[in-house]
Amino acid sequence: MDYRTVFRLDGACAAVTGAGSGIGLEICRAFAASGARLILIDREAAALDRAAQELGAAVAARIVADVTDAEAMTAAAAEAEAVAPVSILVNSAGIARLHDALETDDATWRQVMAVNVDGMFWASRAFGRAMVARGAGAIVNLGSMSGTIVNRPQFASSYMASKGAVHQLTRALAAEWAGRGVRVNALAPGYVATEMTLKMRERPELFETWLDMTPMGRCGEPSEIAAAALFLASPAASYVTGAILAVDGGYTVW
């Protein structure tokens, strides 16, 4: 192992869902800086255009697709493979909804599960086929510390349940594909300063509790999550599969 290049992704082609914004976009920045070619996937065409313009020559293709559509993910994988063999998949697309369980409507529950769980499986299955056939690949899933603990003071049963499912899906695929050369791992971020958490961070009754319960006393930055994703996708993690890597400022050590 060459320690000078072990975190590089030169020659790799990485497909990233949710690539148009937030942590997904930050992961694209990290991968591009490390030499990867990128397949950007997002349901928002305008967000993809902005991301592609920023990332420039690193972008091999941009695909407008909704992860909740299984057929769209199959088509996206085929389109991506026609450009270059995809050796890395990052499942970053995700949503969160705050709600009390007794007041949760069916549509909200189904939407969260459709994006966070179904979408991750559809994408993993679609891109995993070629990886398994080639005998090589790495998948990085965006889980959450919410898949391990119960958040407070806010309630979000659908989000927590979905991220618990993400962690188990990660382990299941890791076990199934380990002997076929494909590694599958997940990140479990804590509270991160993204657009998705902005409205919650502006509520003192939530934000102050978050900081009090985080040993490091602050939110994470998207770049800190992207750096962890880079590790899991890179040759540096060649003997790592089925891991749920906490990147939460120590929140889950309590």
From Swiss-Prot:
Active-site residues (renumbered): Y159
Cofactor annotation: a divalent metal cation
Biotech use, per record: The wide substrate spectrum and the stereoselective mode of action make GDH a very interesting enzyme for the production of optically pure building blocks in the chemical synthesis of bioactive compounds. GDH could be covalently immobilized via thiol bonds onto the surface of a gold electrode, which represents a proof-of-concept for the development of reactors for electrochemical synthon preparation using dehydrogenases.
Activity regulation, short description: Inhibited by the chelating agents EDTA and alpha,alpha'-dipyridyl. Inhibited by Zn(2+) and Fe(2+).
GO terms, molecular function: metal ion binding; nucleotide binding; oxidoreductase activity, acting on the CH-OH group of donors, NAD or NADP as acceptor
Catalysed conversion reaction: galactitol + NAD(+) = keto-L-tagatose + NADH + H(+)
Biological role: Catalyzes the interconversion of galactitol to the rare sugar L-tagatose. Shows activity with a wide range of substrates, and catalyzes the oxidation of a variety of polyvalent aliphatic alcohols and polyols to the corresponding ketones and ketoses, respectively, and in the reverse reaction, it reduces ketones with high stereoselectivity yielding the corresponding S-configurated alcohols. Shows high activity with D-threitol, xylitol, 1,2-hexanediol, 1,2-pentanediol, 2-hexanol, L-erythrulose, D-ribulose and acetoin. Specific for NAD(+).
Protein name: Galactitol 2-dehydrogenase (L-tagatose-forming)
Organism encoding this protein: Cereibacter sphaeroides (Rhodobacter sphaeroides)
Lineage: Bacteria, Pseudomonadati, Pseudomonadota, Alphaproteobacteria, Rhodobacterales
